[in-house]
A protein has these predicted regions:
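N-terminal intrinsically disordered, cationic/polar leader segments
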Residues: 1-308
Length: 308
């Protein structure tokens, strides 16, 4: 992918920052999605996908009015057709600013205040609807919508994705491309109507700091043509030194496969490992019915992939 201009991207990324301890929404920074979509020939008013960006934060804390700290997990989601994304370091600084802020008499009041403020601030920043939920005592929650590990299953058919590096002979394959190279992808006739692939070898780098981001990628393809799985793995590995945000990586994978295969249905989901207490999980699909409802549902927290 093309190198993008980062000169105006953030007042925080790549710089030393003081950690504010009191609630400060001015810390939040947004980035237009168009800065990456243009070179992928994606138009905001005619996207070939639907989906969402899901964020999970594991170290969010604030104080009660008598000074007692409470900790919670925060999950929030917003749609991929929003004009902006939130820049990750600014988000981490923003949620850290709750840490010494007194927000209520009880745990419930504290968490409700975090939810209310974060929904308002993020929705205004991104000019879209952001849904925020807070969770505590996760291991005591009995809801079947919570703490379920189903990422490697197609929700409708309950069929597993095939982990490419564990299934196909790759010992003699030479991997030497570490910048995104869609020419690696090879089209083959589909022997079965649906192909489901997974790899735990996704790695990319932050667009500004070049810090590494590792994750799992899941690909669902339905159509007369599919992609050779080893070539798909080669392509996934080629992101290893690619400097782009998580959302941009997911959209690049989706767009390359969409253009190449012209499938009936396509879904790409990237579950990145947490860094700085947060993980980012973008998903793009050709129709809403293909989306993992649990991922885009802010009220549902799942057991993660091992690295998350």
């Amino acid at each position: 992918m093309s190198k993008l201009d980062n000169s105006n991207i953030s007042k925080h990324l790549g710089k030393s920052s003081e950690y504010a301890c009191f609630y400060d929404p001015s810390l939040l920074v947004r980035e237009p999605r168009s800065s990456n979509r243009t070179h992928l020939d994606l138009q905001d008013d005619n996207l070939p996908f639907v989906g969402s960006d899901t964020w999970n934060g594991y170290e969010v804390t604030a104080l009660s009015n008598n000074g007692l700290p409470f900790f919670c997990v925060v999950k929030f989601t917003y749609p991929c057709d929003s004009k902006y994304i939130v820049e990750s370091k600014s988000l981490k600084l923003y949620f850290n600013s709750f840490s010494m802020t007194k927000l209520g008499d009880t745990q419930e009041e504290v968490f409700a205040s975090i939810k209310e403020k974060a929904e308002k601030d993020l929705s205004e920043l991104l000019e879209t609807t952001v849904i925020v939920e807070t969770f505590s005592n996760l291991f005591c929650i009995k809801s079947e919508r919570t703490m379920v590990n189903e990422w490697n299953l197609d929700e409708e058919s309950q069929q597993s994705h095939i982990t490419i590096e564990d299934t196909y002979p790759i010992e003699d394959i030479v991997f030497e491309k570490y910048l995104e190279d869609p020419s690696l992808l090879r089209v083959v006739d589909a022997e079965v109507p649906v192909s489901r692939y997974h790899s735990a070898l996704l790695r990319s780098r932050c667009r500004v700091t070049a810090q590494p981001d590792s994750g799992d990628v899941f690909v669902y393809i339905k159509g007369k043509k599919t992609v050779d799985p080893i070539s798909l793995l080669e392509y996934i590995v080629s992101f290893r030194d690619e400097c782009h945000f998580h959302e941009e990586i997911c959209e690049a994978i989706y767009k390359r496969l969409w253009d190449l295969l012209e499938p009936e249905e396509l879904n790409v989901m990237c579950l990145y490992a947490r860094r700085g207490g947060w993980d980012i999980c973008p998903e793009r699909a050709s129709s809403k019915k293909l989306l993992h409802s649990s991922l885009g549902d802010a009220s549902c927290v799942h057991v993660k992939m091992p690295r998350q």
